[in-house]
């Protein structure tokens, strides 16, 4: 059952990557660039162009149309999850010397590791939920959870976008879910539930400063803002969030602090929950959803900037650095 659920979630994530990619493709300025859509599946890397498909040569990330070899100068990375957000595709492009948008391999790896991200945020003085990390080779003594209050969240440690997240209400559910998840990734994270106002912040480095596009309040139909709420429309989103200015300023400050200190590049989305006026860090997406219905593009539409200009800036930034 767990494996089927993971496969279903991964299929949804793949579909979202394609929707995000199509929206980015639409917003690439063809007066400046000659773009192609590349789909990367496990054993099938291919270019799709005008209804035709061309195999990618993985040795140098080129492809052929007839006898004409086409070599990419830059990659706009819009793969959600692995290998786009965990540093793997970045390592590959580093090896073959093709520049790419978004964070480098090491920074992407940190953003995809929930526990490392939480430790990082705490070290910056940002509040986080009480949590316990369990490594794959650890013998779990369930007494370590006695100081934590149910309900708890059990999460695979290396996953984005609320994949592999379950809310548990008692010790039996906790034990079952930890046993199900251990070994599927690089550990399991158990967190206390926070009750408050959940918000999402879209931001990027733009022309020498970290630009925050807006704060969106998320009201989910589900028990929490899980992958269905994020990707299947089971949530209401209010942009800009109806929160007081002083709290809004603090959320922006925390988001900028994380972005800057992680040395991120390009689009990012950082989620917080506001409890008693204090923002608690939840998670970070270094490659946020970019379909037309996604939070980030909606925030951009309410700013004085155009997505096309931001995309051009990111491509030029990758080429020039």
Residues covered by each model-derived region:
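Single conserved hydrophobic/aromatic residue that forms the stacking wall/gate
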Residues: 1-8, 12
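Active-site nucleotide/adenylate-binding loops and adjacent lid/helix of ATP-dependent enzymes
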Residues: 5-6, 19, 65, 69, ...
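Conserved N-proximal alpha/beta basic substrate-recognition cap immediately N-terminal to
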Residues: 18-130
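Glycine-rich phosphate/pyrophosphate-binding beta-alpha loops
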Residues: 81, 162, 218-221, 285-298
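Phosphate-binding site of ATP-dependent enzymes
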Residues: 169-253, 273-274, 278-280
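Conserved metal-phosphate-binding beta-hairpin within the catalytic cores
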Residues: 192, 201-203, 259-292, 300
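Active-site "cap" helix and flanking loop/linker of ATP-utilizing ligase/carboxylase catalytic domains
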Residues: 217-268, 295-321
């Amino acid at each position: 059952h767990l494996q089927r659920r993971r496969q279903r979630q991964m299929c949804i994530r793949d579909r979202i990557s394609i929707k995000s990619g199509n929206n980015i493709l639409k917003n690439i300025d063809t007066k400046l660039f000659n773009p192609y859509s590349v789909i990367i599946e496990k054993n099938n890397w291919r270019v799709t162009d005008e209804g035709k498909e061309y195999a990618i040569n993985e040795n140098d990330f080129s492809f052929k149309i007839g006898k004409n070899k086409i070599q990419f100068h830059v990659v706009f990375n819009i793969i959600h999850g692995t290998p786009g957000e965990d540093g793997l595709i970045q390592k590959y492009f580093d090896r073959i010397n093709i520049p790419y948008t978004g964070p480098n391999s090491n920074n992407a790896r940190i953003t995809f590791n929930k526990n490392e991200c939480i430790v990082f945020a705490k070290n910056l003085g940002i509040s986080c939920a009480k949590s316990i990390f369990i490594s794959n080779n650890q013998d779990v003594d369930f007494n370590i959870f006695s100081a934590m209050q149910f309900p708890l969240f059990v999460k695979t440690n290396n996953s984005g976008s609320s994949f592999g997240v379950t809310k548990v209400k008692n010790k039996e559910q906790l034990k079952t879910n930890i046993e199900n998840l251990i070994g599927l990734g690089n550990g399991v994270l158990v967190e206390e539930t926070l009750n408050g106002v959940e918000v999402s912040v879209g931001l990027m480095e733009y022309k020498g400063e970290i630009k925050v596009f807006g704060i969106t309040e998320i009201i989910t139909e589900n028990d929490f803002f899980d992958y269905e709420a994020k990707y299947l429309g089971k949530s209401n989103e209010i942009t800009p969030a109806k929160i007081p200015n002083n709290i809004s300023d603090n959320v922006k400050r925390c988001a900028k602090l994380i972005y800057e200190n992680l040395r991120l590049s390009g689009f990012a989305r950082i989620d917080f929950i506001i409890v008693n006026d204090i923002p608690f860090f939840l998670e970070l997406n270094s490659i946020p959803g970019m379909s037309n219905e996604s939070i980030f593009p909606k925030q951009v539409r309410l700013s004085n900037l155009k997505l096309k200009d931001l995309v051009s800036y990111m491509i030029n930034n990758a080429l020039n650095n």
